[in-house]
């Protein structure tokens, strides 16, 4: 669950930002997110459906002055889920599944907004 991940070049990255409803905390959504992520990992991992790896991120409030251009120093979301897939089509098939929908709907009840945007990896590397 907390192991390093390896992302092959050419994988599709889906970046899902989540804004929680007022009064909802990270602790409130932790179980729902864990169950949803387990459905994806267990049912669609590797040859079963193209899921490669994923990460759940919490915005922690620190902002890089060196890497930021505009005046905004905040985020419009609380959490991000980054998943990596062999293809966008495999991602969409997994998320159309009834079992995934059941788990996602529990999380959605606690969210004010969620956007899932797709990216292609242009560069990646490790420290030498």
What kind of feature is each model-predicted range?
Residues 1-101, 112-128:
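Short S/T/G/P-rich N-terminal loop/turn motif that feeds into the first structured element of a domain
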Residues 107-108:
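Short, composition-biased linear "edge" segments at structural boundaries
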């Amino acid at each position: 669950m907390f192991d390093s991940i390896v992302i092959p070049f050419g994988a599709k990255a889906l970046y899902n930002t989540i804004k929680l409803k007022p009064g909802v905390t990270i602790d409130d959504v932790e179980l729902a997110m864990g169950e949803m992520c387990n459905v994806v990992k267990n049912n669609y991992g590797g040859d079963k459906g193209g899921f490669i790896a994923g990460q759940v991120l919490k915005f922690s409030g620190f902002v890089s002055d060196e890497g930021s251009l505009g005046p905004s120093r905040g985020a419009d979301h609380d959490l991000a889920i980054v998943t990596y897939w062999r293809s966008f089509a495999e991602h969409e098939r997994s998320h159309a599944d009834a079992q995934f929908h059941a788990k996602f709907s529990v999380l959605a009840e606690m969210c004010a907004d969620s956007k899932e945007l797709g990216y292609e990896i242009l560069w990646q590397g490790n420290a030498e």
